[in-house]
Amino acid sequence: MIRIGYRPDWEQFEYRTMDKNYWKAVQYTLLIMYEKGLIYRKKFPVHWCSKCGTALSQAEVGYIQKRGKLYYIKFRITDNEFIEIATTRPELLSACVAIAINPNDERYKNLIGKEVEVPIFGNKVRVLEDNAVDPNFGTGIVMICTYGDEQDIRWQQRYNLPIIPVINEEGKIINSGKYSGMSVIEARKEIVEDLRKLGLITREEEILHNILVHIERSDCMTPIEFIVKDQWFIKSKDFKEEIIEEEEKMNWIPKYMKQRLLEWINNIEWDWVISRQRIFGTPIPFWYCEDCGFIIPPKKEQLPVDTIKDKPPINSCPKCGSNKISGTSDVCDCWVDSSITPLIITRFFEDKTFFNRTYPVDLRQQGHDIIRTWLYYTILRCKIITEVGPFKNVVINGHILGPDGTRMSKSKGNVIMPEEGIEKYGADALRQALLSLTLGSDFPFKWEPVRHGKSFLQKIWSSVRFASQFMMNGEKKINITQLNDIDKWILAKLRNTIAIVDDAMEKYQFHIAVEMLKQFYWHDFCDQYIEAIKPRLYSPISQDDKDNVEAILYKIIWIFIRLLNPICPHIAEEIYHRLFKEREGYISINIAPYPSLDEVPEVDGNNGEKLVDIIASLRSKKVENRMALSALVKKAIIQESKEIIELCKRNEWLLKEVLHINEIEYKEGRREITLIN
């Protein structure tokens, strides 16, 4: 981080989520939320990852597409009458507690109120009507299992259906006769084989379907099961409107990312499961009564607590009188910890004066992949605790992908380490290339922009070395009365650059700032202005004119390196120490004031723009005639408008010196340039 120029204020704002003081802060916020009636514990079907062995929140899971099979299975109504149900999960047959059809599906009106026998297991279940059934999927009939997906949970609660758990925490089948103890995949294979033998599978279709997986961890991606477990929850569904209100107040960069959070909030169906069955983490800071479930909070002065090791503040349950009080081995979801970072850095817990001065914080910068976790949970928790949203600005960045356009992964061999770019091209070239990308979008990593960035840095260095021969000669101020047309042009360009770069940086449009700085310094300053002033430095028409040019050089480079500093801090700091520190007096360029328009005289650069255009045309004509730019031209005939001819005559000495022309002849008319040797 140091090598690439990343230097936050570690001394004031560093924190570690594994420290006891951080645990204390996390537990205190949970105590606040408990006192507001927002923490509860209950049995509920939760998203469960059998590989990680823990419950997950809705934000940690997501759908991926995989190939699979859709099995059409016969369910018996009477001895000679069957219906067909299509499912991708025949291993859940033992958990089937009902059959559902769409009430508008005329094909199955006769089934309403009947019972259907579940194949292999023989239990009978009733037929329900529900509008959520898709009549176009499979046969239009679905089996309701406990639990195959979120829809099964909704139906179970809506119709008060029985619960038959058939998958345990290890991902093994239970309560399913001879299939018990098998993995989900093994049980599916065996049940399908038995159904085939019984003639109960009528057809099998290869399909591409969505599977719910543990998507937050790319090294997991295990299919999710729904397991009924005692878990700890925060009431989050109740705060949808408040969170939407807060996100509307924030300045989003890019603006369209706000929609992602909005869509997530509107799709939240369950309260936040905050407990995790892991070894390490912030302990859930509550005890509970084993008999009635009453929650017993710690006293504030007890924090931090580990309820497995520490004694509760009371010996018996205040609700039922039982002395069976237990702690919990569960730890907090990591987002419970991370969601209070704005409170940590603004010292909410220990310095209210500092907190009131610094909260809400200016900026949250993060990736788009954790909008629905870190960002959402931070807004939720901070809003509940402080009654104010945590951020003024939210900047969402994309990901740098591998050169092949896919996510970087060691297994794919497409990982680009920052050290490689720093060693080869320098940190500033790498920073420049990355800041040239548009915020919010993912980009495959390419070396070409880094190489181009290094070329720009080399251009800066060589131009500064040239200019340093002249611009350090004594204290000089720009004399506005002695500016010629091309001086006015470069100063007008400089003012425009300051304005555009400042505006772009304020709006976090770093790619615009990078492009503008390149355009000004490389093309306007180096390619045009420096080439145009060389005769005035080497063969000055007067000492006053030379002094003015040197003052302009000083002004431009001093302003430019301060504009460049946030993007390329290493070269900016180096140039500052070599050329400017003694005169300007700041210990570092980072302490120097950011450039303002007040530093540059306001002048009209229009004539200079036209003059630069003429110079460019003369150069192009040399190239067209296969002449070196330094080759001597006997005579140039410039055909132009009267206005441009007058401009050229005023600057004829400059044109002759810069373009190595002996004589210039002028004609009125449409632009045409002729070179005669």
For each predicted feature, which ranges?
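A short glycine/serine-rich beta->alpha loop
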Residues: 358-369
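Auxiliary tRNA-acceptor-end handling modules of aminoacyl-tRNA synthetases
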Residues: 88, 213, 222, 228, ...
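Conserved oxyanion/phosphate-binding beta-strand-loop segments in alpha/beta enzyme cores
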Residues: 1, 105-132, 161, 222-245, ...
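Short hydrophobic-aromatic micro-motifs
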Residues: 83-87, 92-101, 141-144, 224-226, ...
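Protease-associated
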Residues: 78, 83-144, 149-154
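Metal-dependent nuclease catalytic cores in nucleic-acid-processing enzymes
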Residues: 150-159, 192, 371-387, 615-623
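Residue patterns forming the tRNA-binding/recognition surfaces of aminoacyl-tRNA synthetases
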Residues: 1-82, 137-291, 374, 406, ...
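Feature 926 captures the class I aminoacyl-tRNA synthetase adenylation module centered on the KMSKS loop
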Residues: 72, 267-336, 340, 384-427, ...
